Every structure is written in structure tokens, then in C-alpha cells.
From Swiss-Prot:
Residues modified by glycosylation: 40
GO molecular-function term, one example from the UniProt record: polyamine transmembrane transporter activity
UniProt topology in membrane: Multi-pass membrane protein
Full protein name: MFS-type transporter FVEG_08288
Keyword terms: Glycoprotein, Membrane, Transmembrane, Transmembrane helix, Transport
GO CC annotation: plasma membrane
Family classification: Belongs to the major facilitator superfamily.
Keyword Transmembrane set for record: yes
Length: 227
């Protein structure tokens, strides 16, 4: 039922990023294990740490950045309650942070794919993985937080739907990654993945920011009918 509501569907659409995570994970393993890197299993495992460090740092800094953006947007239009507490709206989550995250995580996968193809010194693709992890966590955080704001009365259901779709996309990514990479090569796979993620993510962000005010009324009415 919730997926029929536009803001929920589009927030889940932005979660296409989940698919890219698992495609990249398989690309890391096969890429570093092959020539010219020829990493052993332990070293390949250590390569995943750069993405993990990006996740950790982003989870620490991303929330503060998003909070500052939301407070700025509320102050800009003097939106507060009778006690002077700032009131934020769901679309306040998607400002420059959304565009930065949605742009950099696909581009970092492109960076990774092409530097791996040309056998550039291993710290260069490793750096791409760090940027990917950092910006992807920003992407996940703002998407989940905004979704709970849209469906406050059913926030747990909204997050469940989001996770359900993410898991499906993760499964798809895991299944298609190896044959896709074998068919077109790492660089072209990452190029196509970059384009898909950029287009779908940008479309979702643009539609939400453009229509959020109108959709809030429709969403509140629909949620009341579900009660």
C-alpha cells in the first residue's frame, strides 16, 4: 500500500544505490585478485576497509550536516512553533547534501572501474572506494530519515518497505554483477552503473523537492484512510 504513495515510491527509487553496493563488492574482489594487483585473500579483504571507513565517518558527520541544513531551511522561512522551536519538513533533508551524495557515489564507482582497468597504483581505486562509502552513507541516511518524516504515523512501515526494496535490489546486484562484468568488462559496467544511478537518483530528488508540498497533503489523507 505504501509503495503506491509517490513520495514513498520515489524515496525507494533513490535506494537503487543498494544495488550498486553489491555490484561494487564483487568488482572489488575480482578486480584486486586479478593482474596487475594479484592481491591474496587477506589483502583483498583489507581493501574493503576503505569503504567501511567511509561509512563510519559519514555516519558521524552526515547527520550533523543534515541537521544544520534543516535548521537553516526552517530559519530561512521563519518556520517555528509557539515555543520558538524550529519546524522541519521532509523536503528540507534534500538540499545540497542530496545532490552531492547522489553525484559523488556514482562518479566514485566510475573512478574505481576505470582506474582498476588501467592498473593504476592501488591507492587510487582504494581512495575511490572511500569516497563511495562516505557519500553512499549520506545517501542512505537522508533517504531513510526523509521517509520517516513523510510517514510519521507509520514510520516503521515506511522503513520496512524501504529495507524490503533495498534487499531485493541487493539480491539483483549480487546476481547480475559477475556475468555483467564478464560480458562488458569492469570499466563499462561501472560506466553504465554510474549513469543509471545518476539518472534515477537525480530524478527522484528533483521530483520530491518539486512536489513535496503538494504530496504531503495527499499523503496525510491517504494515511488517515489506512487507519
Amino acid at each position: 500500500m505504501l509503495l503506491r504513495l509517490p513520495p514513498v515510491f520515489l524515496t525507494v527509487l533513490i535506494a537503487i544505490a543498494s544495488c550498486s553496493v553489491y555490484i561494487l563488492n564483487i568488482a572489488i574482489e575480482s578486480g584486486f585478485a586479478d593482474s596487475p594487483y594479484n592481491f591474496n585473500q587477506t589483502t583483498v579483504g583489507l581493501a574493503y576497509m576503505s569503504t567501511g571507513i567511509g561509512y563510519i565517518l559519514s555516519s558521524m558527520a552526515g547527520g550533523r550536516w543534515m541537521d544544520s541544513i534543516m535548521a537553516r531551511e526552517a530559519r530561512k522561512v521563519v518556520r517555528s512553533d509557539s515555543h520558538g522551536k524550529l519546524i522541519s519538513l521532509p523536503e528540507d533533508h534534500m538540499k545540497e547534501n542530496a545532490w552531492v551524495a547522489n553525484t559523488l557515489y556514482p562518479l566514485s564507482s566510475l573512478w574505481f572501474g576505470w582506474t582498476m582497468y588501467y592498473g593504476v597504483q592501488f591507492m587510487v581505486p582504494i581512495s575511490a572506494l572511500f569516497v563511495f562509502g562516505f557519500t553512499l552513507m549520506l545517501h542512505f541516511t537522508l533517504g531513510t530519515t526523509m521517509l520517516t518524516e513523510f510517514v510519521r504515523k507509520r514510520s516503521s512501515a515506511g522503513v520496512t518497505v524501504n529495507n524490503f526494496v533495498r534487499n531485493i535490489l541487493s539480491c539483483v546486484g549480487t546476481i547480475v554483477a559477475a556475468p555483467w562484468m564478464k560480458g562488458v568488462g569492469l570499466r563499462y559496467m561501472m560506466t553504465k552503473l554510474c549513469i543509471i544511478c545518476l539518472l534515477l537518483g537525480s530524478l527522484g530528488i528533483w521530483l520530491i523537492t518539486r512536489n513535496a508540498q503538494r504530496w504531503r497533503g495527499t499523503l496525510d489523507k491517504a494515511l488517515k484512510e489506512m487507519d
